[in-house]
Amino acid sequence: MDSTLISTRPDERTVSLSRARRAALGSFAGAVVDWYDFLLYGITAALVFNREFFPQVSPAMGTLAAFATFGIGFLFRPLGGVIFGHFGDRLGRKRMLMLTVWMMGIATALIGILPSFSTIGWWAPILLVTLRAIQGFAVGGEWGGAALLSVESAPKNKKAFYSSGVQVGYGVGLLLSTGLVSLISMMTTDEQFLSWGWRIPFLFSIVLVLGALWVRNGMEESAEFEQQQHYQAAAKKRIPVIEALLRHPGAFLKIIALRLCELLTMYIVTAFALNYSTQNMGLPRELFLNIGLLVGGLSCLTIPCFAWLADRFGRRRVYITGALIGTLSAFPFFMALEAQSIFWIVFFSIMLANIAHDMVVCVQQPMFTEMFGASYRYSGAGVGYQVASVVGGGFTPFIAAALITYFAGNWHSVAMYLLAGCLISAITALLMKDSQRA
């Protein structure tokens, strides 16, 4: 019997509700910071970075360059997953989670004071890419640790609900980042916003970091991780990520396929559509900034509600339903954009970025972490999650913008791209064994 798996189902009596709540709150607080910082970059890249950091190229190429730097962060996420996962499996989840918040906050604040191309020339985009890489490295270690600590600390029959705070943090981060950018945008002229207004949300990250560190300081390691330490002497002979790859190679491919729906629905609605609707359709930028506010606010309710349903009726059922809703909403979303119908744009944005997206993300924490043994779970789930981020999400706005450019503004290829990703996720979930019922 695999000793690393002995501790995957600890006696329910050892699970402390107090510890579970602190773990859920700490995971949520850190996730808010990391996702606020990470998503803020995507929003600002769509509005500002093409002109502030890439003014020497055409508007279309500037947009592609800005979205390419957005994707750079995703390239460094697997590396963060490997490094933080390795030490998280050896030294504990909490230490790594404190470090990820520090790194993300510092990198984001530095972007807020970064001089533009007109001041320091090509050093501006070089430094921007460097700081974006640090952001990606930090968030690469965040999800695995936060998901594990909340799942391992949760009662057996409420793992989706207690760990949903990791994804609610995404919604709150989206709400805060979009809300602050929208507020600054309304309070400033276009010239003021491009000159200094966009920097304020990046500097505000410092406040969020201090709050998250205070909350996370009260967390404890999970009972499951502490039990696993009995087998640490044997585990030290193996590198955790290698152990995960050797024992569960198929799990990484499953995670990539399962995350396509989540990544494409969110980044097409919140990042790509913001640029496409303003540059190609002539719609006001406030439209998708306000949609981002709405989506972020609703997700704070929909994610825990869907997680509760998943604990009660089955994670896989909820996942498949969400992915199919994304599949069916892909073309109608772009048809609404073409018709410039505000009602239907908002409706299908919610269907994609709230209903479809939130139904799949609410169960990912227990679904993905239970694919791996406890002694290499941080590495396995974390790296798998972040590799999927690169393959399925990091360059989604870039790919979508490139498709629009290649097909001379025609949106059908992007809609098909979105539809295919959601359908692949639905089929993968359908073919999986339901570990919740095992």
Question: In which residue ranges do the predicted regions lie?
Answer:
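Multi-pass alpha-helical transporter architecture, strongest
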Residues: 212-219, 367, 419-438
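Cytoplasmic membrane-interface "Motif A"-like loop-to-helix N-cap segments
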Residues: 90-101, 312-324
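C-terminal transmembrane helical hairpin of 12-TM major facilitator-type secondary transporters
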Residues: 317-363
